[in-house]
Amino acid sequence: RVTYGGGRYHFDDDQETPDTGMASFDFGHCTAMWDQSSCNRRRSETPPFVSFYGEGGVLTTNTGQNYTLYDLDGKELERKSLPTSDAPHFANFVNAIRNGEKLNSEIGDAQVSTLLCHLANMAWRTDGAVDFDPAKRRLIGNPAAAKLWARDYRPGWEPRV
């Protein structure tokens, strides 16, 4: 189940995603929360972009190659900081298409995390909640969200599998 509360509170424009909100992802055995505010004038005093809270501690990161690991009392256990760049990821993707190179990250993994963003957006744009069957990969009981599941394509541009 995915729930979302929030809205467009800062800019009155045609953007289709909220500038402030919180998503809750209930996986049955655990819950993940996403809290964001892209238009708040006050920024966080600390630089982490994402924090993962687990049973044994907290991992904070601001990029894919920088992280800090803390125990439950806030004591720093480990820190890793490397220069980052998206260039190797883009090059790997292009080489996978052109030369059959193995992807550094499987496309299915990216699809799962992207799906969570889409489900949260569907929840926000409909009644605030979306139920999803991961085995069947189908929405459950939300006809308004189901209308957002796929798009209408112009004639001649329909995807063919």
Q: Locations of the language-model features?
A:
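Contiguous beta-strand/loop segments that form the cofactor/metal-binding neighborhood of enzyme cores
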Residues: 1-66, 75-108, 114-161
